[in-house]
Every structure is written in structure tokens, then in C-alpha cells.
Amino acid sequence: MEKITLETSKTGSDLVLETLRDLGIDTIFGYPGGAVLPLYDAIYSFEGIKHILGRHEQGCLHEAEGYAKSTGKLGVAVVTSGPGATNAITGIADAMSDSVPLLVFTGQVNRAGIGKDAFQEADIVGITMPITKYNYQVRETADIPRVITEAVHIATTGRPGPVVIDLPKDVSALETDFIYEPSVNLPSYQPTIEPNELQIKKILKQLGKAKKPVLIAGGGVSYAEAADELIALAERYQIPVVTSLLGQGTIATSHPLFLGMGGMHGSFAANIAMTETDFMISVGCRFDDRLTGNPKTFAKNAKVAHIDIDPAEIGKIIAVDIPVVGDAKKALQQLLTEPVVHLNTEKWIEKVTQDKNRVRSYDKKERVVQPQAVIERIGELTKGDAIVVTDVGQHQMWAAQYYPYQNERQLVTSGGLGTMGFGVPAAIGAKIANPDKEVVLFVGDGGFQMTNQELAILNIYKVPIKVIMLNNHSLGMVRQWQEAFYDGRTSESVFDSLPDFQLMAQAYGIKNYKFDNPETLEKDLEVITEDVPMFIEVDISRKEHVLPMVPAGKSNHEMLGVKFNA
């Protein structure tokens, strides 16, 4: 490695901040502690990077995730050693599951103390090995710029993911008068970006034979910013589109070719189309169990083409006839530049449209506020243009089903790991990254109690998110499963008492409201148009279930709770 002599000596912490700034990083989410004191001392006088002080390391990680998920930019977090680093584990695992580009600096004890059970020592490199795309422990101060440059490249290319840099305290404090050249030389890491042209031609050849084609749009379409190409392909060949949870927004919910989200809580039309299709083209979707149901019966009469940046995902769950490794945007562009093939999907489109129209959304009730009505009204008030953040649970599925999404990266949620507590900090990160966009958070009373301490920073950093808590006095999704599959034994899923959430909001200096009247709900919710941090608690029906529902292990056509029009 080539050495570069510095004009003046610099500490490791100076090199961290300067390298990040040179790579275009302008925001860090973090929480200080002993092992990162040299870095925070450098942050004190450093210009060009804004530091957001969270209230818990898990919160910092989810804030960085919200920042990254809503923009596609790298999210950066800093935590101290030992408990600071272990508190960050959930956020790192969540980012790995959802392919979120994160760079996480963990403090570490001095090099001489590593492996000797020093105060606040934890083997974070070993702990995070299964839940990171890559991780480093820096052993020389001069190596910091090279390691960071490599780490950013790894986190943001190919299939994005989290990279951890473990930084011993003395490495960050020591001065050096030279650095190793900060270049990227990774011969063993060469992600395939350009799809194979012959495989693209095979897709079109098979498409020409299809009578019932379906496009599946996963989160990879958003990450590749390929929504325009996806829609163009669907419109060119009149192919109906089903999305995964993380694929929501890649095609507008109002588009006539959109059938809805597929899978466990997917729409009737989407699940039936995936069952009956004879040719499925999946783009940026990993075929997780929440989408496929029983994999043995999933699309069992279909040929399957699978486009994915990660070759490890192709054929992992579902047998694939036409594998295509490469960037989703480039693959779709190639499909659009090839000569047009001829097919007639008129009868198929007529059939799936009928399926779409024969199902009513939900039964309206007069005496209780229904969560679906809340989300629909927020959709109207925000004109379907807000960044929607959710926590995890029933409200997450209702938000996926009933908000009128229009754009990619519009839904920010914890998909693969299903992390309760994700919502509040992720909404903060999304708003900091998108100050000119409305950011609305839907959260349950369970998840809200896990990370609500992050509300403390809303006024400090002027983050006017709208927190809408759908309060059903329970862990709603757990309760739903207990009522459906455990003979109604709601073991430890109902809250016998709850704190006064209105007082909590007041304690944080946040404008707060509580609504429980279905007759005035439409008018009540108009308060969200004010540009201030806001907490809205809505008491909703305590018995509402998310429907339709495919029971675990069942096939997608075996949906429960489908309500047809008379």
C-alpha cells in the first residue's frame, strides 16, 4: 500500500471526520461514551458534518436507517464500546435484513486491552459478523482513511448493507504524519451490475408465450430507483404488478395495473394472480415467507424469472427458470431496449381487474374509530405524498394496505426483521434527510413504548414529524394470532394499564391531541397540516384484525377474512 505524507500530523479522529466529509457525508447519528471520547472531542470543533445526539444507541441506528431508507444515501452512526455497541445490534441486524446502506463506528478499548476483559469491552467484530455485510477493526491510525473508503464502497454498492468499523480508543487518539492511500482495491468483491444479455432475451422469449404474466416488485426496485422502468415495462406489455411490503410505492396504488401488496396480508387480487400466473417476473424481491406463503405451492404453474443484484437470493426459496444477476434498473432498461414481443393479456387483465373490484376494503363501523379510516384520511390530507414511516404490528399492515402511495422510497418500515421500536427514530431520520417532505409515523401503543425517548430531540433539532399512535391497548398482531390460532387465549398481549401518553408528549414539549370519536374523525385529523412536531393518539377498535390473512404455512389462495361485494 502506498504511503501518503501529511503536511501536518493528524489524530485518528481527525482522519475519521475528514474522510467522511470528503466522501460526502454530512450527518451522523450517535451517542458518546468513554471509548469514543477522542472522536467526540474532534466533532466538537469540526465543521461540515452535523451530529444528531439520540437518546439510546438503538434509536441512533434506526435514525440512521430512516435517513438511508428514505434517500438511498449512506446512514452513519457512532456508538461507544461494550454496551453502546451491543445496544446497536438490533439496528445493525435490521439494516442487514432490509439491505440498508449503513456505516457504524463502534468504539473499542485500547489495543493493549483487547481480549483481556477490559472495562466496557465486547467482541463486536465477532458479534456482528453474521449481521453485517463486512466489518473491520482498525489497528493502525494511518489505515483509517483507507478502511473508511473501502467500507463506504462496500456498504453502498451491489446489494447495500451495514458495515461496522471497530475503532480502538488509542487508534482514534494517536497522531500520524502519514496515511495509507485511501483507494478501493477489493478483487474478491466485484458485484455484478450488468445483467447477462442472453438471460434478458430469454425473459422476453418466455413473455411472448405467456397468457397470464405477473410482475413482482420488491424493495430492490426502490433501491435501484427503477420505478419508472418497472412501470414502463408493465404498461408496454400490459402486465399486472404485485409488490412486496418494501416494494410499495414503486407503482402508484391508483395505477390500473397495480393489484396490491402480495402475501400474508396482501390483497385478494394480488394473491390470486400470483397463484394463477403462468409467467412471473420478479425484480428485486427475495421471495421471503411473508410473500410466498407455502413455497411448495407458490406460483406452481408458472415459469419464474428472477432479477436480483444478489446471486445468493436466486433460487434460495423458489425454483427459478431464468436467473438474472444484476442491477434492477439496468435489467429493466435492457428489457425495454429489446425489440417488442407480442402477447395478448386482455383476458388476463380483465380477470385480475374483476378480482380487484369484487372485494370491498373493510366493514365500516359507527361506534368505534377504525384504523383503516385513520390511514385513509391521512392519505387524503397529505394527498398521498408524505413519507410514511411505520413501526411493526397491525398498524404497519394497515398502513401498507390503505395509504395511497405514489413514489418509491415513500414507505419506510422494518420489513425483514420486523423490529418493534423502529418507528419513532426512523421517522426522525427520514425527516432530517427530507426536511421539505411531510413525514407521518404510524405507530402502535406497544412499539411506541420501546423507543419513545427519541421524542426528546424533536424540538432540539426542529424535526416536525407527525406521530399518529393507533392505540388498541394491546400488542395487536400478537393478540390477533392468539385469537385466530390459540383459541382466544390472549396471553400477555393486552395492556391492563397504559401511561398517559398525552402527558408524555407534553413533557417533551410536543403538541398533542387525542381522538376517539368516529363521527368527528375526518375533521379532527386536519390538525396534521400544521408544521410542528405533533403527537396524535387515536383510540381505535380493540378487536380489529388485519385482513385478509394467509395463515403461516398455507398457500396464498387460502386467505382468511376476504370480504366480497354483494
Question: What are these model-predicted stretches?
Answer:
Residues 2-7, 142, 301-394, 503, ...:
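Phosphate/pyrophosphate-binding active-site segments
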Residues 2-341, 377, 381-384, 457, ...:
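N-terminal alpha/beta PP-like core and its mobile active-site loop of ThDP/TPP-dependent enzymes
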Residues 164, 306, 389, 442-443:
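Generic enzyme active-site microenvironment
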Residues 31-33, 52-62, 77-84, 139-140, ...:
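Active-site nucleophile and cofactor-binding loops and adjacent substrate-binding regions
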